[in-house]
Swiss-Prot record:
Gene Ontology molecular-function annotations: glycosyltransferase activity; hexosyltransferase activity
Enzyme class: transferase
Ribonucleoprotein as UniProt keyword: no
Family, per entry: Belongs to the glycosyltransferase 2 family.
InterPro entries reported for this sequence: Glyco_trans_2-like (IPR001173), Nucleotide-diphossugar_trans (IPR029044)
Keywords, ordered alphabetically: Glycosyltransferase, Transferase
Enzyme Commission number(s) of this protein: 2.4.-.-
Keyword field contains Transferase: yes
Name under which the protein is recorded: Uncharacterized glycosyltransferase MG060
């Protein structure tokens, strides 16, 4: 079995070695891994860092590709258009995140069962010295079926593994805009038929690092992009994820200022979320967020 790990990077020379080491140091001996570094137009010394790592490792394939800047969605499009991911399984690891020590071994165990086309872990959300374990799904839910139940509010790509055929069925992502990772995960989960949930933290998500998309100020272009993402999520029957975007106060205030409302086609359904996510989102929707949505019915 072979695993393709896509690492999108942009000016992350100071972080990317840790990301790669979280693969190199934890690779099972009987698992073939190819790492695809897609440099989205970095102007730092990322290329030199990668060359140094390539000279040092010999237990996996590490390939480096440089392209003009087009943002996160363009990286996924680049891999798909050039058919670079050759593994039976594909995952995306952002260059400022890392896998947990046992993630790849646990993934391999379930992938070998040949029953699933998506294997989804929980993850740690990291800020300074604080860690929060984020449950992608309810803790005791293992095999996830049903379009609405497969969706998750925690839709970063970290520690989410998809079969090759799922990856290559993805529609083209938007380029030259940010925050396409949620759209990537949404589509992949919709395409996957048999999703398995591993209720262990598969990686560490450093969401407030300098350069991370979540640390970008709320200027007008970011706001416009976020509004479009919410519309895309709703259009693709993932309106619950759009609602999660409205939990952010700054975004909500701007939506109020612009008097924007989102039109949905059905009632909200939080059945696939962890119990406290269901509780919080249900309360937030009924008491604060309902006013941001119109029904098309």
């Amino acid at each position: 079995m072979k695993l393709s790990v896509i690492i999108p990077t942009y000016n992350c020379a100071s972080f990317i070695e840790k990301a790669i080491n979280s693969i190199v140091k934890n690779r099972p001996n009987d698992l073939e891994i190819e790492v695809l570094i897609i440099d989205d137009g970095s102007i730092d010394n990322t290329n030199k860092v990668i060359k140094k790592i390539q000279d040092q490792i010999n237990n996996l394939t590490l390939q480096y590709f440089y392209k003009s800047n087009g943002n996160w969605g363009s990286v996924i499009n680049y891999v798909r258009n050039n058919k670079l991911a050759k593994g039976e399984w594909v995952t995306v690891l952002d260059s400022d995140d890392i896998f947990s020590k046992k993630t790849i071994s646990i993934f391999q165990k379930y992938a070998q069962k040949q029953r699933y086309d998506a294997i989804i872990f929980d993850y740690y959300k990291c800020w300074k010295k604080f860690l929060w374990k984020i449950p992608t799904y309810a803790r005791f839910r293992k095999e996830i079926k049903g379009e609405l139940k497969k969706q998750t509010p925690f839709c970063i790509p970290l520690a989410k593994f998809f079969k090759n055929e799922v990856f290559y069925q993805l529609p083209k992502l938007r380029e030259n805009v940010g925050f396409q990772d949620a759209i990537y995960t949404m589509h992949a989960l919709q395409i996957a038929n048999n999703v398995f949930h591993v209720s262990k933290a598969g990686g560490y998500y450093f969401f407030k690092r300098v350069g991370n998309s979540m640390s970008i100020p709320w200027h007008s272009s970011r706001f416009d992009i976020e509004v479009q993402i919410c519309k895309d999520l709703i259009e693709n029957n993932a309106q619950e994820i759009a609602l999660v975007h409205l939990l952010r106060l700054k975004f909500r205030n701007l939506v109020d200022d612009k008097k924007i409302k989102f039109t949905v086609k059905r009632d909200f359904c939080f059945s696939g979320f962890s119990w406290y996510s269901r509780l919080i989102l249900s309360l937030m929707y009924n008491f604060w967020l309902k006013r941001y949505f119109n029904s098309s019915e």
